[in-house]
Every structure is written in C-alpha cells, then in structure tokens.
C-alpha cells in the first residue's frame, strides 16, 4: 500500500507537533510521501509563519530594514530544530532568502518559503529525500497551473524516490519564478502528489477529526461524518463547509484515489473518508448541513410569462452582461426569482434593473436582501420519503419562514433560503430533526 500524507500548519506549529507527525508517519511504512504546510499558530494570539513572511517582504519591498522581522522568522524555525534535537542548519537558506527579498523576488516567493523551510526540517527529521516543489509543480508565465505537465514531471521524479518530502502550496514556472496556489493550497499539492505516485490513499492531517455534519461554531458538539462522496463534498464545500481546499478534490477524484481527513492530535480517530461512491448506508438521512449568507433575491413578475418564448434567457443575459453569476432560480407560472450574491449585485443593481425592464418589460420587480442559503446534502435522501416535509416541519417549529426551496434532480441536496437573522437557528433546527431525533 502507498500513502501520501499532508499535514496542515497547526500540525507543524512546534517541535511538539512535529514529534506527533513523526510518530504518525513512522507508524506505517506505507506513508512514503509527505507534504508539509508552513508552521501555523502555536496558540490563539500567535502569528502564522506565512503571515510573518508577508510582513517581512512588505518591509523589504518598501525599502525598510527587515532584519529583525527575518530574524524572528528564523527563530521560529530554530525553536523547532532545537526542540527536535537536530544537528541541522538553515543559515544558508536564510541568507538566500535575505538576498532575494532585497532584490524584490516577489510576494509569491516570500510566502512559499514557509513550506520550503518546514519541508527541509521535516526531511531531515524523518531521513527522507527533500524535493523542492518548484522542480515538480509547474505554472505557465501567466501564473496558471499546468496540471498535465505537472503530473508528468512529478511522476517521473517521484518514481526515483522511495520516501520524499515535497513542500506544499507552491510551484514555479519553467524559468524558475515561484508561483503559489491560493491560501490553503498545500491541500492541492498533496492531491497532486497522490495522483503522480498513484497512491492508494491520500491522508490529509489537520486539527479536526474529519468533516462535521454542521458548523461547530453554530452547532455545539456536532457529530462527524464517517464517509462522504465527492459529489456530496462538492455540494457542502460550495455552500461554505471548509476543511479541505476544494481544488484539492479534482486530481485525486480523477485518479480514483480516496481522501482520509484525520486529526494529528487524535490519530486513533478514523476521521472522514471521501470516496467516489459507496454502498455503505449513511447513519443519518443527511450527510451534512452547510450554508452561507449574503444573498439577495430579485423576483420578476409578468402575466403570461410562461407563454413568452425566451423570457428566462433574456433575463439571464442581463446578469451575464453585467458579470453577475446566478446561484438559484426558482420560478412559477408568472414569476421567477433569481438569487445572487448581494455584494456582486449591489455593484451593478441599477444597470441590472434597467436591463431587465428593457429586455422583458415586467409588470413588477421586487428586491429582497440579507438572505441566507442552506444546503441539506445526503445520498440517503434519495431513498427516504418525506425529507422535504421534515425540513419544513423543523423550520416551522422554529418559527422560521422559508423564502425559497430548490431540489436538484439528483435528489442529492435541497437548498432552502431564509432570512439572515434566522440563519443560525435554521441550521440548529435542521440538525436537531435529522441527527438528534434520529439517534
């Protein structure tokens, strides 16, 4: 068996955390390829190393003396090295960083050094080969990631390495200019490595024991999800659930490699297994609940709307022309409601309203802002009668008015719209009826 293991910043914030990671890797020989993040916070008031690097480079870019800022970063790493008892020095690496900062190497280069340096320490600690991600993760000159080229380069390079540490978050152009993924991009690197070596499993280690059914900031003591499909994960991630960078899904999904979300601080926990498909029946009707607020609804009314050929297309064209994407579009015979992100809509509100009037000459347009959308997601819904009824019942019992409901033809998810003020109570009510009352 062959595993790729990625560890997040909180898992590598200190020497003590490094030791936990070392124990996890050494516990199974199959954990052959390691993708580390930069050191995260050691305590709530602490600063992540990536943020320290951004601040240090900003000072350098402004022509300020950045010596103390760079020394503070070096101290963070030295503390880890000393705590691990390593006879290992990063002096040469920091001298190169100092020189490149002075020569304005760029913020992408600056941010990437957190993973680069942590990777060097990890390789020394484990006795694994260190492979600079700049050698195997390729971007074009525009900064766009090159998936297939990366897979070819990485596959050929890792084929020669029995065990290796590959820093996450960054890569480089063919000319060597460092480019980073978006924040949290080490998840993507782990996924790319898993695909390149055709791993049996991609373990993503963080500070939580997998995905939770609902946001723990809203639902205290939310239960964890044992198994989730890629489709379910995509639906939940789109509506705000976050543990894994959503772009990390595609490389391993394409290769048919499952992902296991694990907890560095509780390695005995099984975590959440993410798979393409499963015959396992879920414990609950739903797999998860996720939502986000900040939406607006535009309701358009016109008599005989359903008889007017091209009505919807004309309305949608107005939104497209103004660069505003549409989230959901429930409709009736003579009405259609369009849900959009409030901030995007407000930037072009008058142009869009004028465009709708010109395009379809509606009888009436009504606007409503400060709305939230909640997704109830689960493969178990397809074989369960009365799911929508239970949703309405739960929300009615909590005195919450439903502004919109939309169910996809796959029966994988149901979206409900509620007022912003009802958002948290709605999630609590849905969790109670689908999880707590089903125990």
Which residues does each PLM region occupy?
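A conserved regulatory-domain signal marking ACT and ACT-like small-molecule sensing domains
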Residues: 270-439
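Structural motif
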Residues: 2-3, 31-34, 128-129, 162-165, ...
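Nucleotide/pyrophosphate-binding catalytic subdomain
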Residues: 1-244, 249, 341, 417-419, ...
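Surface-exposed amphipathic alpha-helical tracts and adjacent flexible/coil segments at the periphery
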Residues: 244-246, 255, 265-272, 346-349
């Amino acid at each position: 068996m062959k595993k790729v293991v990625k560890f997040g910043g909180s898992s590598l914030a200190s020497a003590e955390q490094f030791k936990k990671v070392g124990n996890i890797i050494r516990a199974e020989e199959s954990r052959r390829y390691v993708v580390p993040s930069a050191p995260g916070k050691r305590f709530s008031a602490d600063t992540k190393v990536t943020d320290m690097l951004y601040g240090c480079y900003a000072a350098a870019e402004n022509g300020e003396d950045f010596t103390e800022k760079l020394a503070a970063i070096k101290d963070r790493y030295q503390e880890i090295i000393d705590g691990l008892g390593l006879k290992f020095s990063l002096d040469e690496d920091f001298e190169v960083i100092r020189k490149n900062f002075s020569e304005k190497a760029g913020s992408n280069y600056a941010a990437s050094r957190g993973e680069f340096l942590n990777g060097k320490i990890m390789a020394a600690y484990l006795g694994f080969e260190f492979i600079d991600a700049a050698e195997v993760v390729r971007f074009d000159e525009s900064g766009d990631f090159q998936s297939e080229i990366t897979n070819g380069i990485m596959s050929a390079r890792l084929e020669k390495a029995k065990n290796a540490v590959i820093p996450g978050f960054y890569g480089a152009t063919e000319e060597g200019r460092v480019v980073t993924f978006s924040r949290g991009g080490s998840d993507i690197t782990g996924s790319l490595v898993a695909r390149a070596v055709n791993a049996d499993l991609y373990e993503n280690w963080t500070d939580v024991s997998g995905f939770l059914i609902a946001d723990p900031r809203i639902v205290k003591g939310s239960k964890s999800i044992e198994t989730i499909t890629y489709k379910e994960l995509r639906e939940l991630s789109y509506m705000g659930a976050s543990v894994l960078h959503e772009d990390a899904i595609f490389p391993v999904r394409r290769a048919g490699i499952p992902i296991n979300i694990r907890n560095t601080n509780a390695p005995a926990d099984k975590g959440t297994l993410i798979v393409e498909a499963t015959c396992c029946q879920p414990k609950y009707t739903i797999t998860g609940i996720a939502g986000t607020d900040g939406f607006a609804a535009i309701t358009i009314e016109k008599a005989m709307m359903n008889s007017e050929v091209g009505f919807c297309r004309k309305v949608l064209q107005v939104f497209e022309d103004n660069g505003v994407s549409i989230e959901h579009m429930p409709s009736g015979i003579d009405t259609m409601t369009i849900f959009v992100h409030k901030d995007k809509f407000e930037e072009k509100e008058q142009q869009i309203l004028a465009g709708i009037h010109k395009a379809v000459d509606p009888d009436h347009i009504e606007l409503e802002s400060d709305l939230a959308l909640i997704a109830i997601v689960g493969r178990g819904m397809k074989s369960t009668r009365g799911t929508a009824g239970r949703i309405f019942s739960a929300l009615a019992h909590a005195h919450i008015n439903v502004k919109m409901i939309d169910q996809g033809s796959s029966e994988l998810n149901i979206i409900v719209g509620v007022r912003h003020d009802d958002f948290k109570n709605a999630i609590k009510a849905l969790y109670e009826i689908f999880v707590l009352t089903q125990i």
